[in-house]
Amino acid sequence: VLETEIGPIVFEARGESNPCSLCARMRRGALHDAAKRFGCNKIALGHHYDDAVETFVMNLFLEGRIGCFSPVTYLSRKDLTMIRPLIFAPEREVASAVRKAGYPVVKSKCPVDGSTQREWTKNWLRQMEKEHKGITKRLFGAMKRGHVSDW
């Protein structure tokens, strides 16, 4: 676990009312810097299938653009490659594997965890899946077949 001052900066010093974007950028920066300090050229992230679909939907509805993070991203300014080896694994399968293996789960310390736009999107997709079986698979397929960068 990498200790940072991101929380106090985002919530106290900056007093962000919508902190997620700034926090995410700062966390990525801290992770990239730590990887470089350790001499790493690749970072494996834990984004899974559901994260990708949620991001795709959030980008479409909230930003008016078609986009999502890609399975592999090269960051030329940092000379780092980001890989997402769990991208085709649904969240429930990842959670099940973690429980079966007995891996520890680090709980988020974020004061807005559980009440974010991502959480709303996750719940909305869950409801849409009940009403329109297979919608999540179709959205994921649209990312793969569409013109989403690096898919």
Q: Model-predicted segments: where are they?
A:
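Active-site adenylate/phosphate-handling loop in enzymes that bind or generate adenylated species
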Residues: P8, G15, P19-E93
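A structural preference for short, hydrophobic beta-strand core positions in alpha/beta folds
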Residues: V1-E3, K107
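ATP/NTP-dependent adenylation/nucleotidyl-transfer catalytic domains that generate, transfer
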Residues: E12, G67-W151
